[in-house]
Curated annotation (Swiss-Prot):
One of its GO terms (cellular component) is cell outer membrane. InterPro entries: Lysozyme-like_dom_sf (IPR023346), MltF (IPR023703), Solute-binding_3/MltF_N (IPR001638), Transglyc_AS (IPR000189), Transglycosylase_SLT_dom_1 (IPR008258). This is Membrane-bound lytic murein transglycosylase F. It comes from Pseudoalteromonas translucida (strain TAC 125). The keyword Glycoprotein does not apply. The lineage of its organism: Bacteria, Pseudomonadati, Pseudomonadota, Gammaproteobacteria, Alteromonadales.
Length: 470
């Protein structure tokens, strides 16, 4: 009897141990044990990159949010080609891939996809100046795409109904480098996803869209195919919460919200002005920026005056930073038409606005809110923040406030506010424009594409210029 009880006890212990061993062997258990999740991504402006402020990128921030959700550290592993990244996933060196990759049946045979969290479209692009291709029959030059990419898989599918279609593939270049090759005339065509194309056209407006290849392709994270559902099972509630609490929307707005609208003529004029006009004033932007990024100050100035020191609006704002008479007095500007004074005053005023933003609000939301205040005044921005809070959204997030600013033109909203009617819709476009100008200027500056700047010019007031007393 005692022996039988002992056997039962030993059996139960062994079963419990077996369950524990099985539990410890799951992917999620291993991640918890190591206290980190290893995420692979392609290094790019839309996924992951190193900036002055540290690590940045849509997929990086989303991956960090998932790591926080799991309660572990994030180990981001950047790659420069798909083959290496897929191989590392298959070998178990990565827990998942977060790289804005599209779902398709070919990939789904090899990998497991998480929930769809975005959609993109694929476009055929070419350089402005050659005849626009409107379908595959119009392609007369060389078309190149990345090997093993969704673009390659798409073309393989298209070729079944277009047998004359030919293209080459490469693992040496990434998507942005292929776009640059089109600009440089090294290739005639390539395919690009809409979000990458939108970011790239900020500083290369000559890149044009021939026609759409696909529409609304689903984007999802990728895992190894296995019977282990432990990690996959948590992706579903994570993305559900990210959509429910607006986290996905906020990230979309941060990285892509300001680049959805593209104007070829305006972008081309801006790039030209950076090379021809900006060098005259760049020393002053740098000198008076203080803790601000001088390139942000310059982008603000371009939005205000297109770097015209004699600019004037019907409402009485004047100069390269378009200061009102009252604002000029506040910041010690005696002549709004003198560009050095005006730049100094504009920088001082923007800094004051940023300091006025509640300390709890982090960057870059502080700056976007301050830019909106530069346009319509802090009072109106704060009215929009109050409406935002009343509607259950965050008054501290620009992505939420920008959706409510346009409500200030509607009587049923502005009559209940402290400062009343305001063109909040204009303020939203204003901030989006500055963000586009800033992004382009940063890229051109860091790639040494701005002309060498001369000594700051001395601009004497002409007869008839205003000279104001403090």
């Amino acid at each position: 009897m005692l022996k039988e009880k002992l056997i039962i006890i030993i059996t139960l212990v062994m079963l419990l141990c077996a369950c524990d061993i099985q539990e410890q062997s799951t992917q999620l258990a291993q991640i918890k044990a190591q206290n980190k999740i290893r995420v692979g991504t392609l290094a790019s402006a839309s996924n992951y990159y190193q900036a002055v402020q540290g690590e940045q990128g849509f997929e990086y921030e989303l991956s960090q949010a998932f790591a926080d959700y799991l309660g572990v550290e994030l180990e981001i592993v950047p790659f420069f080609n798909l083959s290496d990244m897929f191989a590392r996933l298959q070998s178990g060196d990565l827990d998942l891939i977060a790289s804005g990759l599209t779902y398709n049946k070919t990939r789904a045979q090899q990998y497991r996809f998480g929930p769809t969290y975005r959609t993109i479209s694929q476009k055929l692009v070419y350089k402005q100046g050659i005849e626009r291709p409107r379908d595959y029959d119009d392609l007369t030059g060389n078309l190149m795409v990345i090997a093993k990419s969704s673009h390659s898989l798409t073309l393989q599918k298209v070729k079944k109904s277009n047998p004359e279609l030919n293209w080459s593939e490469t693992e040496e270049f990434d998507e942005e480098e292929l776009l640059q090759a089109v600009i440089d005339g090294e290739i005639d065509y390539t395919l690009a996803d809409t979000h990458t194309l939108s970011l790239f056209r900020r500083y290369h407006p000559n890149l044009s869209i021939g026609f759409s290849i696909t529409h609304n392709d689903p984007i999802a994270w990728m895992l190894r195919k296995s019977n282990d559902d432990s990690l996959y099972a948590l992706l579903v509630p994570f993305f559900g919460e990210a959509k429910q609490n607006n986290q996905l929307y906020v990230l979309e707005e941060k990285y892509f919200g300001h680049v959805r609208q593209f104007n070829y003529v305006n972008t081309l004029a801006y790039i030209e002005a950076i090379k021809e006009t900006l060098p005259k004033y760049q020393p002053w932007f740098e000198q008076y920026a203080g803790t601000l990024d001088w390139r942000l100050l310059a982008a603000l100035s371009y939005q205000e005056s297109m770097w015209n020191p004699r600019a004037k609006s019907p409402t009485g704002v004047r100069g390269i930073m378009m200061l009102t008479r009252n604002t000029a007095k506040q910041v010690g500007v005696t002549n709004r038409l003198e560009p050095e004074q005006n730049i100094r005053g504009g920088a001082k005023y923007l800094s004051k606005l940023i300091k006025r933003i509640p300390d709890r609000i982090p960057q870059p939301d502080r700056t976007w809110l301050a830019l909106a205040a530069y346009n319509v005044g802090w009072g109106h921005v704060n009215d929009a923040r109050i409406i935002t809070k009343q509607q259950g959204a965050s008054p501290d997030k620009w992505a939420d406030v920008k959706k409510r600013l346009p409500l200030l033109i509607k009587k049923r909203y502005y009559r209940k506010t402290r400062y009343g009617y305001s063109r909040g819709d204009v303020a939203v476009s204003y901030v989006d424009n500055i963000r586009r100008y800033y992004d382009a200027l940063v890229w051109l500056d860091e790639n040494n594409a701005i002309e060498e700047k001369p000594e700051a010019p001395v601009v004497a007031p002409k007869i008839g210029d205003e000279v104001e007393a403090k």
